[in-house]
């Protein structure tokens, strides 16, 4: 049905917990890379229900929500509506938000982000903080200072913050228009794509991605071959090209030998 496969998710969760003492789950949503899929509120209800049932075994479960692209997915409040649902999870399921400050504030090269713990008790939150302090120091020492200085200055200046928010909204709207153009054109061309909601990339199922990618290169079209498909970056091409590209890809996939 081209929606989140809750049944398979439940099977994987329960199967892994049967074989091991703890489980870490990473969900990249909204605006998943490389498909552009976003879990709906109904999807989140299923995730919470599955994890609540699975937690009955008493083992530790960590749900990591990789929300790096959340502020480029669409309306910022709308795409955060799933957050209260994480409060419904039982005590032995810890939720962690992986948030990218460098992406949200268009500072990609500075590589700055945050892990935000959503715990049911203060003891769990304190333990999470202690573990992160030690593991972070041992892995990369301190976070990028330049990014921290820039962000502190942005939040210390309301006018600058408003400018940054406006700039991000401009690029978010541009990205949404490109994604809409590509998906509409894909439908018109009969090009099958993985369900797309928002984001920087669109994925196309393909039996021989390397061959199709090589064929497209002959026409000056460069896309990334994946294990089972092709990845198109709608973030890197114009809206006009997003409308033209699906038909070109479809034609390449239908050539003899592909």
Model-derived regions: residue spans:
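PLP-dependent class I/II
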Residues: 1-258
